[in-house]
A protein has these predicted regions:
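Conserved SAM-binding loop of SAM-dependent methyltransferases across substrates and taxa
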Residues: 125-138
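Non-catalytic substrate-recognition/targeting regions of SAM-dependent transferases
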Residues: 6-22, 29-96, 103
């Protein structure tokens, strides 16, 4: 199993009772996670001093409760910069566990000894797109959501990769 342990700006701090406590840069968020089935004490002080909490509705969906959280902020993974903003269905705009995949294919791209082209489908906000572009690949980023494509362009600009994907 690969572990995404190279993050400096993201960590899972604790988890219990269907929720996880995460640090995204300097902000602490509580989000539901159906995989968290254990019921351990929520002793970490972050549970009480969170910046945002996504509350799932019994009817489906849910909503964010913001305690002290900007509309948008940035986190970094190695040389990449991501713009985060909580939006519907508990998302923040990034799946940090995917960093292991980014590292794997970035190494393959750098060591290929030839030009590499990548087609990133369902590309969301561009984590994989940016990692491949930063490693030297020519990338085509495709997502059905115009908003996600715009967000990926923002992330590319923040990472100094506007001319790449």
């Amino acid at each position: 199993m690969w572990i995404a342990d190279q993050w400096k700006d993201y960590e899972v701090i604790d988890c219990s009772k269907g929720e996880k406590l995460e640090r995204w840069g300097e902000y602490i968020l509580v989000r539901p996670d159906p995989q968290v089935i254990w019921d351990t004490p929520k002793n970490d002080r972050g549970w009480k001093h969170k910046n945002g909490h996504y509350h799932r509705s019994k009817k489906g969906g849910g909503e964010w409760e913001f305690i002290s959280l900007p509309e948008q902020w940035q986190i970094h993974y190695k040389d990449l910069t991501f713009n985060l903003k909580p939006f519907s269905f508990k998302h923040t705009g990034l799946f940090p566990e995917q960093a292991t995949n980014w590292d794997w294919f970035s190494e393959k791209i750098r060591n290929a000894g030839r030009p590499i082209k990548v087609l990133n489908l369902f590309a969301y906000t561009g984590g994989a797109t940016l990692a491949a572009a930063a490693a030297g690949a020519s990338v085509t980023h495709v997502d059905a959501s115009k908003g996600m494509v715009s967000w990926a362009k923002e992330n590319a600009a923040s990472s100094g990769l506007s001319d790449k994907p």
